[in-house]
Each structure stands twice: as C-alpha cells, then as structure tokens.
A protein has these predicted regions:
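Structural recognition of the beta-strand scaffold that forms the well-ordered cores
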Residues: 10-15, 44-50, 89-94, 124-129, ...
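Active-site beta-loop-alpha junctions enriched in small/polar residues
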Residues: 16-18, 53, 95-99, 131-133, ...
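Aromatic-lined carbohydrate-binding/catalytic grooves of carbohydrate-active enzymes
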Residues: 31-136
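Glycan-recognition surfaces
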Residues: 110-113, 152, 158-264
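Carbohydrate-binding surface patches
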Residues: 246, 252-255, 260-262, 300-342
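Catalytic cores of secreted or luminal carbohydrate-active enzymes
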Residues: 247-299
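Solvent-exposed beta-hairpin/edge-strand motifs
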Residues: 337-355
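C-terminal beta-strand-rich structural cap/linker in extracellular carbohydrate-active enzymes
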Residues: 360-385
Length: 385
C-alpha cells in the first residue's frame, strides 16, 4: 500500500470513446480477453477502465454507490477479479461534483466512502471527472480531497484527474497527489481536434514528469468515425486516415501523455494494431526519465512543420518531425538546434521507429520530404565521427 504509482505514463483502454453509456459486464470481460489475445497486454497496455454510466442513479440507504443491476448483475468486484485473473488492472470512473457528466451520483461529500468502496471492489485506477462542481468548492480542493481519500483507502489506486485544464490546474496538480491530469478539453475523432490539442500543449512540457503526467486525452487511433465521440452537435465529423492516426500516436508518445486506447479493440484492423503496438514508439513514451520534449521549430511557421526532441535515458534522443500542413513538405533538421555543434566531432545515428531500421549516421543536418499529416520519428544516438 502507498507504493509509488505511475512512474511512467499509464497505458490501457477506456470505454467512453467507443461505447459511451452502452457498457456491461460481458463487454468489459471480452475487452480483457482481447487485450491478451491481440498482444496489447504484451505491448504494455494494462488498465481496463470503465467510464461513466456504470452505476444506478441513486446511492443505497447507506450512501454507497451501487452498480447498475442490468449492466453489471454480479456487481463490480467480479469484473475486477476477472480482469486481474488476466494479469491486467481495473479502472473505474467517478466525478468531483454532485453528479457525473451523464447525471449519475458524483463523489462530492462522499470521497472517503467511495474510495473505500473502490478499494473493496479491487479498483486500481480512478478517472475523476469535473461535472456538476458545487459553487462552494474549487477544483484544487476537490481533487486534493479525493487524493487524500485514495491514499487512505487501503489499496494502491492510480488517480487520474480530469478537470480539462480549468482552475489553473498546471499550478497545483502535482502537489494534489494526482498521477495524471487532463489539460485539454475532450478529444474528438477528427484531425482538427488532434491538431487543436497539440497546439495547446506546445508550452506544457515543464508541468509533466514522473508520477504526474500531462494527459492529452484518450487515443482515437483506429476509431474511423465509429464511436460515441464521432459526433459534434449531432453531426458525424469523425474519422482520420491511418497516416493521421500514426502521427496522433507518435505525438502522444513524444509528449509523455498516457496511452489510453479508445477504439473497439475487438475490431482492430492490422493497421490499427501496428500503430498501437509499435514497440519503438511505446519505448519513447515509457522512457523512465519521463522528460518532456522541446520544440526546435515553432508551430506558427508558414509550413506548419515542426520537430520535437526528447532526451532519453542512457544518452539517446527521440526526434519527431511532423507535417501538419495539407501538402507534402520538406523539412531540414539542423543538429546545431538540438545541441550538437559541428565542432563536437560527432554525428547522429538515426534509427527509424516506424521502419524499424538504422538509416545511417548524419552530420550537421538531416532533411526529408514528409507527406501531409505524416511524421518521421527517430531514436538518435550520438556517435564519434
């Protein structure tokens, strides 16, 4: 109990993006089965998280949360036990307000009781949303309350704070006790949403680190317009190309965001599975130093191309070159900007994390043509010439 949790960004699956309120015991168990059978577990994904709409609309006579008898007729603990039997971990959802975002009971003024309930059920991860916040309470206090409750519930539970970047969260979230925190609004399954989130995060590197990770929201990789978050104001606007999903995943990995899958893993295409299980990209995300990347080309340049560079444990560097423009663009990466002057007598050996091969050793610069909405990601090793 109270062992260090989430040294690196959590990896797993959340039910909301695809299923919304339409969840049940059979579905969650089947997802756990597919985690094992598809290789997702072996790739490092471990949390199966039930989002909103899992409970009854009212608490019981003792003020305790009650699972929806139609969705979870055997309760929550047997589901958690089943997931644990697969060598995975189980997560659940609640809210800092009086109600959840979908109108179910929230944890306001029930924080310690709910934390104990979650511990009794075998919960390993809590996503804690921010709807129906009482006017008398501020976000910092609400998240500190649940953090304290979880730290005293008798079980180690990863605490995912989801207040969408409100109330100056960057200034207080680390000391609150949360292990990850949302600093953006909800993601949608479309390229414009991904681009907007990335734009909002280019100055947030300093706020994320070991044991407290900046959550850029769940992944939409592989959704292809099918799911609960594919609509905006009733209109279907969802779906990205596999190239865009590849870039989306690479950016989340480079930025140390938790990697929480949102698609229906039972129906993954080979392309989706290849993106989500790319061991070289995942290794960048799970690097134990958890250092944020720095941007060496500014976002607002006319071509909308930029590069991120991230120091890795052992002396290597992750380098991502991204083209957010609507046309093919040439990008030149000057090694001087990374910190490698010509006078050093050294170059960079570049390993392509998508082709899974060494490209060669380069001096001073590397240039490439990058397709629209595509990316190149390298693991770079400094070598003597």
């Amino acid at each position: 109990m109270n062992t260090p949790l989430a040294h690196t960004p959590p990896m797993g699956w959340n039910s909301w993006n695809t299923f919304g309120w339409n969840i049940n015991e059979e579905l969650i168990k089947t997802v756990a089965d597919y985690f094992v059978e598809s290789g997702l577990k072996d790739a490092g994904y471990e949390y199966i998280v039930i989002d909103d709409c899992w409970s009854e609309k009212q608490r019981d006579e003792n003020g305790r949360l009650v699972p929806d008898i139609n969705k979870f007729p055997n309760g929550i603990k047997p589901v958690a036990d089943y997931i644990h039997s697969k060598g995975l971990k189980f997560g659940i959802y609640s809210c800092a307000g009086t109600h959840t975002c979908a109108g179910y009971p929230g944890s306001f003024e029930h924080e310690f009781d709910d934390a104990e309930t979650f511990a009794e059920w075998g919960v390993d991860y809590l996503k804690y949303d921010y709807c129906y916040k009482p006017k008398c309470a501020d976000g910092e206090n609400l998240y500190k309350r649940m953090a304290m409750a979880l730290r005293n519930c008798g079980r180690d539970i990863v605490f995912s704070a989801c207040n969408w970047g409100n109330d100056g969260v960057l200034n207080w979230i680390r000391e609150s006790g949360a292990h990850l925190f949302r600093s953006t609004g909800d993601i949608q399954d479309n390229w414009l949403s991904i681009q907007s989130i990335v734009e909002s995060q280019l100055t947030h590197e300093a706020y994320s680190g070991v044991y407290c990770h900046n959550d850029m929201d769940m992944l939409v990789v592989g959704m292809h317009g099918k799911g609960d978050n594919a609509e905006v104001l009733g209109k279907v606007v969802g779906g990205c190309t596999d190239t865009e999903y590849k870039t989306h995943f690479a950016l989340w990995a480079m930025k140390n965001s938790p990697l929480m899958i949102g698609c229906d893993v039972r129906k993954m295409t080979p392309e989706t599975k290849e993106i989500l299980t790319n061991a070289d990209i995942i290794a960048i995300n799970q690097d134990t130093e958890c250092r944020g990347p720095y941007c060496i080309r500014q976002w607002n340049n006319p071509e909308k191309v930029f590069a991120l560079v991230k120091p890795l444990c052992g002396g290597d560097y992750a380098i991502g070159m991204f083209n957010f423009s609507d046309k093919k663009s040439e990008m030149s990466l000057q090694f001087f900007d990374i910190g490698l002057p010509t006078s050093s007598g050294r170059g960079l050996e570049l390993y392509d994390c998508h082709a899974h091969e060494i490209l060669g050793t380069y001096t001073e610069r590397y240039a490439a043509q990058i397709e629209s909405h595509d990316c190149l990601v390298f693991r770079a090793k400094v070598v003597k010439l």
